[in-house]
Amino acid sequence: MPSARDILQQGLDRLGSPEDLASRIDSTLLSPRATEEDVRNLVREASDYGFRCAVLTPVYTVKISGLAEKLGVKLCSVIGFPLGQAPLEVKLVEAQTVLEAGATELDVVPHLSLGPEAVYREVSGIVKLAKSYGAVVKVILEAPLWDDKTLSLLVDSSRRAGADIVKTSTGVYTKGGDPVTVFRLASLAKPLGMGVKASGGIRSGIDAVLAVGAGADIIGTSSAVKVLESFKSLV
């Protein structure tokens, strides 16, 4: 793994401007305390700052879809969040509901404890549905929980299932946005042609730069404006 200094420099080299960083940020609101007005404000911020998309729960994805369409903000909904331990049939209903409402991306939590082959079967079903809508599928792997061999198998299962991107963590149980975790996941996913989303504990511009330097293509954060504003002091 490169040194922290090298990772930081790589991140700065890849992020030429605040606009570059904004275009990589999935601005996220998944708090149980979130109100509809909170979500509306997040979508407005995503429009104002040019964030990549807004990541919401299924219920708010549906409720807010009209505003998002009006403002030109892409919506991503979590599926099976946060444990992933719902039957596939339930996840497919969730996915169908948000896709019909206009979501263009899904952040899916599979039932990881069932093992890589079960993850393959589950993600395959969700990908098949998502692709019929032209939607992007990201698979959340809770990378810090697994040894390298298991994580490699989970990444490969996601690829074989047709997912586009693997994501470090939900941010609920592990803080997967650190450069070590991102580098581990990117080292496995990038050779397979998959994108990498870093999420979990990214709250500053430095955090975002380190994640990108370690191999992240996308940054997931519930502190999107703070991250972007603090990044401006670095460039």
From Swiss-Prot:
HAMAP family: DeoC_type1. It is found in: Cytoplasm. This is Deoxyribose-phosphate aldolase. Catalyzes a reversible aldol reaction between acetaldehyde and D-glyceraldehyde 3-phosphate to generate 2-deoxy-D-ribose 5-phosphate. The active site is at residues 107, 167, 197. CDD domains: DeoC. InterPro entries: Aldolase_TIM, DeoC, DeoC/FbaB/LacD_aldolase, DeoC_typeI. The enzyme is also highly resistant to organic solvents such as ethanol, methanol, N,N-dimethylformamide, and Me(2)SO at 50 degrees Celsius. Loss of activity is not observed in the presence of these reagents even at a concentration as high as 40%. PANTHER family: DEOXYRIBOSE-PHOSPHATE ALDOLASE. NCBIfam families: deoC. It comes from Aeropyrum pernix (strain ATCC 700893 / DSM 11879 / JCM 9820 / NBRC 100138 / K1). It is an enzyme of class 4 (lyase). It comes from the Archaea. GO terms for cellular component: cytoplasm. One of its GO terms (biological process) is protein tetramerization. The gene is deoC. SMART domains: DeoC (SM01133). Homotetramer. Keywords: Cytoplasm, Lyase, Schiff base. Pfam families: DeoC. The keyword Lyase applies. Its high stability makes the enzyme a potential candidate to be used as a synthetic catalyst in practical application. Gene3D superfamilies: Aldolase class I (3.20.20.70). Extremely thermostable. Retains full activity upon heating at 100 degrees Celsius for 10 minutes and at 80 degrees Celsius for 60 minutes. SUPFAM superfamilies: Aldolase (SSF51569).
